[in-house]
């Protein structure tokens, strides 16, 4: 029986002054353990999603936790039948999740972590303002009931959204969430700096909520977008039914694929009328390479799995 692939999303905000020197040893540890995916290193910590066999993931986590600074690195797991990644990378960044506001540091100030088992009670409080900190295309396919969608295209837009819409003197309790916990943790640090006092965020994010809260008790509605070839996962952490438009990154469902504006790998109903001619030509050329490689039974040229036709 084929061993399932373990997908591990991990992060930790911790000062890593030698983060540049960690790149090569970390890359070697990933390669030695057969781990695919991308990890980001910055002065503020580590972040990324990787996949491997059970032994491979355990080996990488053991290596990471041998560093006293990473002994309690947060991680959550899901499973799939095929490798969702085909490359192994370690990238050096200014931030492990890009907010773009100098001075925001979860290592110095952060909101109150809320365990998944306590999340439903918190967000059911009518005095709590519930904000989804993810991008618009992620929110569109699933979110918590009653959550506010900031309709941001990138996390960099989040600070301006908060300044334009909320007031610390009026909004006394704020709860936030994201896919794996990292974005809302940094958002909570920003909110505290803006004067909000009671700031909460979901520990481990949506994925940890899926892992620990029974589906019959769930307040989640829809699928959750993930940053790998699965595109989305359901509450039981199995792969969803969505594909992804590689022109605009928006998830596409069966209805989208039936649209006259959907062309596999080229455009979808969300972007067909906004793509530049250069982007469209590039997408067409890339799709031709993919179809040719598939016909010749060669590996996917840009590192994805071939999905069955819908």
UniProtKB/Swiss-Prot annotation:
Active site, renumbered: 178 (cysteine persulfide intermediate)
Entry-linked Gene3D superfamilies: 3.30.70.100, Rhodanese-like domain (3.40.250.10)
Alphabetized InterPro entries for the sequence: Rhodanese-like_dom, Rhodanese-like_dom_sf, TrhO, TRHO_N
PROSITE patterns: RHODANESE_3
Rhodanese domain ranges (all copies): 124-218
Reactions catalysed according to its record: uridine(34) in tRNA + AH2 + O2 = 5-hydroxyuridine(34) in tRNA + A + H2O
GO molecular function terms listed in the Swiss-Prot or TrEMBL record: oxidoreductase activity, acting on paired donors, with incorporation or reduction of molecular oxygen
Record-annotated disulphide pairs: none
Keywords, comma-separated and alphabetical: Oxidoreductase, tRNA processing
Superkingdom, natural source: Bacteria
Function per UniProt: Catalyzes oxygen-dependent 5-hydroxyuridine (ho5U) modification at position 34 in tRNAs.
Family named by the database record: Belongs to the TrhO family.
Protein name per the record: tRNA uridine(34) hydroxylase
């Amino acid at each position: 029986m084929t061993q399932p692939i373990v997908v591990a999303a991990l992060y930790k905000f911790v000062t890593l002054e030698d983060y540049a020197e960690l790149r090569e040893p970390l890359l070697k540890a990933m390669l030695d353990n057969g781990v695919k995916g991308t990890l980001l290193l910055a002065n503020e910590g580590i972040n990324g999603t990787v996949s491997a066999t059970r032994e491979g993931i355990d080996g990488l986590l053991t290596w990471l936790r041998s560093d006293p600074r990473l002994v309690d690195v947060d991680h959550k797991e899901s499973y799939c039948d095929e490798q969702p990644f085909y490359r192994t990378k370690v990238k050096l960044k200014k931030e492990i999740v890009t907010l773009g506001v100098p001075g925001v540091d979860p290592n110095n100030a952060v909101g109150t972590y809320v365990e998944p088992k306590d999340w439903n009670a918190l967000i059911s409080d009518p005095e709590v303002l519930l904000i989804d900190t993810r991008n618009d295309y992620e929110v569109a396919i699933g979110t918590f009931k009653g959550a506010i969608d900031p309709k941001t295209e990138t996390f960099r837009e989040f600070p301006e959204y908060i300044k334009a819409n909320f007031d610390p003197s009026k909004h006394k309790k704020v709860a936030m969430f994201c896919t794996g916990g990292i974005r809302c943790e940094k958002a909570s640090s920003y909110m505290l700096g803006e004067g909000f006092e009671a700031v909460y965020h979901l520990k481990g994010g949506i994925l940890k909520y899926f892992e620990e809260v029974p589906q019959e008790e769930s307040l989640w509605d829809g699928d959750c977008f993930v940053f790998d070839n699965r595109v989305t996962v359901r509450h039981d952490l199995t792969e969803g039914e969505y594909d992804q438009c590689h022109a605009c990154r928006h998830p596409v469902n069966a209805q989208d694929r039936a649209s006259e504006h959907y062309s596999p790998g080229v455009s979808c109903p969300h972007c067909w009328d906004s793509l530049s001619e250069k982007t469209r030509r590039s997408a067409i050329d890339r799709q031709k390479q993919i179809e040719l490689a598939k016909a010749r039974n060669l590996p996917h040229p840009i590192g994805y799995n071939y999905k069955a036709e819908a």
